[in-house]
Amino acid sequence: MIEELAREIVKRFPRNHKETDPFRVLISTVLSQRTRDENTEKASKKLFEVYRTPQELAKAKPEDLYDLIKESGMYRQKAERIVEISRILVEKYGGRVPDSLEELLKLPGVGRKTANIVLWVGFKKPALAVDTHVHRISNRLGWVKTRTPEETEEALKKLLPEDLWGPINGSMVEFGRRICKPQNPLCEECFLKNHCEFYRRRGKGEVRNRTER
């Protein structure tokens, strides 16, 4: 049943990735941290118009990037990370992005979510990226009972076939923004309400507020 529901989410909320080059996926994902998609796209476009390769970015100073990526927020920190990542890629990996989770996690500012997105979008490897949306929705539906995104990732890998690991992230993000919102979720409009533990608990008065997981 969980697999069927997951496929329905992917079907209703398809997410197409405009960029698939591993380096650009990596840098864009770093820029996407704590900001909206439209801000990420604007910042990425401006950045890659000036700096097209790891080699070019490795020679830059963080302050050279400020105006280009300002729209992404936290631009000073992100600029430092992007330059440092680029230098490491050039010095240690010959200008290539590593295609293993272990190596990606060694890069500054790269956590499991970012690494898994790079593996899936950039290398088409089965990888399951879990952000706050995926973590929240999976728990609300009752698919998992976990406390952290890391625990959710491991639990979902056991529940879903590999072909769903990649697509489920982007689709759940859209589902979480439109329907299963962090606050005031649109439960009555949701196509999954008859299969949702959170909805059943609300009906029984067990959920005290609309923000509870």
Swiss-Prot record:
Cofactor binding comment, as recorded: Binds 1 [4Fe-4S] cluster.
Looking up InterPro entries in the UniProt record yields:
DNA_glycosylase (IPR011257), Endonuclease-III-like_CS2 (IPR004036), Endonuclease3_FeS-loop_motif (IPR003651), Endouclease-III_FeS-bd_BS (IPR004035), HhH-GPD_domain (IPR003265), HhH_base_excis_C (IPR023170), HhH_motif (IPR000445), Nth (IPR005759)
UniProt keyword annotation of Secreted present: no
| Annotated catalysed reactions | 2'-deoxyribonucleotide-(2'-deoxyribose 5'-phosphate)-2'-deoxyribonucleotide-DNA = a 3'-end 2'-deoxyribonucleotide-(2,3-dehydro-2,3-deoxyribose 5'-phosphate)-DNA + a 5'-end 5'-phospho-2'-deoxyribonucleoside-DNA + H(+)
Q: Which GO terms describe its molecular function?
A: 4 iron, 4 sulfur cluster binding; class I DNA-(apurinic or apyrimidinic site) endonuclease activity; DNA binding; DNA-(apurinic or apyrimidinic site) endonuclease activity; metal ion binding; oxidized pyrimidine nucleobase lesion DNA N-glycosylase activity
GO BP annotations listed: base-excision repair, AP site formation; nucleotide-excision repair
Question: Which amino acids does the record list as binding [4Fe-4S] cluster?
Answer: C180, C187, C190, C196
Q: Which residues cross the membrane?
A: none
Q: Which UniProt keywords apply?
A: 4Fe-4S, DNA damage, DNA repair, DNA-binding, Glycosidase, Hydrolase, Iron, Iron-sulfur, Lyase, Metal-binding
Q: Which SMART domains match?
A: ENDO3c, FES
Any Pfam family matching the protein: EndIII_4Fe-2S
Top-level taxon: Bacteria
Q: Which PROSITE patterns match?
A: ENDONUCLEASE_III_1, ENDONUCLEASE_III_2
Query: EC number(s) in its UniProt entry?
Result: 4.2.99.18
Does the keyword section mention DNA-binding? yes
Cite the HhH domain residue spans from the record: 101-120
Task: Write down the required cofactor(s).
Answer: [4Fe-4S] cluster
Which NCBIfam families did the record assign?
nth
State what this protein does: DNA repair enzyme that has both DNA N-glycosylase activity and AP-lyase activity. The DNA N-glycosylase activity releases various damaged pyrimidines from DNA by cleaving the N-glycosidic bond, leaving an AP (apurinic/apyrimidinic) site. The AP-lyase activity cleaves the phosphodiester bond 3' to the AP site by a beta-elimination, leaving a 3'-terminal unsaturated sugar and a product with a terminal 5'-phosphate.
Family, similarity comment: Belongs to the Nth/MutY family.
Cross-referenced PANTHER family: ENDONUCLEASE III-LIKE PROTEIN 1
* Identification of the protein by name: Endonuclease III
What species is given as this protein's source?
Answer: Thermotoga maritima (strain ATCC 43589 / DSM 3109 / JCM 10099 / NBRC 100826 / MSB8)
